[in-house]
């Protein structure tokens, strides 16, 4: 069964590219251009979440959303990867309970390796 990857990023170009890449690799991409709520994530119940740290127009940062996800019993086992162009991403990921991080711009091979690691 195809794994569902929730991508939350305010960059339309990144969403478009990831949609193509993930679909070609056999995943089901679920794309959100703005932030989403924990309740919405409960309904979607993805197998992996790629979460931008800075989401324009949303009151919470990606790491705040990640922390909320990890506090929810039914969502806490879903792997979350933070994504950002920021340098200090490793510490932010650790602090919010994320499973890892990816720096922008993406290296597609590294991205797919991380995705496969968490969706095996």
What are the language-model segments listed below?
Residues 61-64, 86-103, 113:
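Alpha4 helix (beta4-alpha4-beta5 surface) of REC/receiver domains from two-component response regulators
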Residues 107:
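Receiver (REC) domain switch/active-site region of two-component response regulators
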Residues 12-30:
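Two-component/phosphorelay signaling modules centered on CheY-like receiver
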Residues 81-83:
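Hydrophobic/aromatic residues positioned on beta-strands within the core alpha/beta folds
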Residues 26-35, 40:
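Short hydrophobic/Thr-rich beta-strand motif most characteristic of the beta2 strand and flanking loop
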Residues 61-76:
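Short amphipathic alpha-helix used as the core "switch/output" element in two-component signaling
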């Amino acid at each position: 069964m195809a794994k569902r990857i929730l991508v939350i990023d305010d960059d339309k170009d990144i969403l478009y590219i990831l949609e193509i890449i993930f679909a070609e690799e056999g995943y089901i991409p679920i794309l959100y251009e703005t932030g989403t709520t924990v309740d919405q994530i409960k309904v979607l119940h993805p197998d992996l979440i790629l979460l931008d740290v800075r989401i324009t127009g949303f009151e919470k940062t990606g790491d705040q959303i990640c922390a909320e996800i990890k506090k929810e019993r039914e969502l806490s086992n879903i792997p979350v990867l933070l994504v950002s162009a920021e340098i200090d991403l490793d510490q932010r990921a650790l602090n919010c309970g994320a499973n890892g991080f990816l720096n922008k711009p993406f290296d597609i091979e590294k991205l797919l390796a991380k995705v496969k690691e968490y969706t095996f």
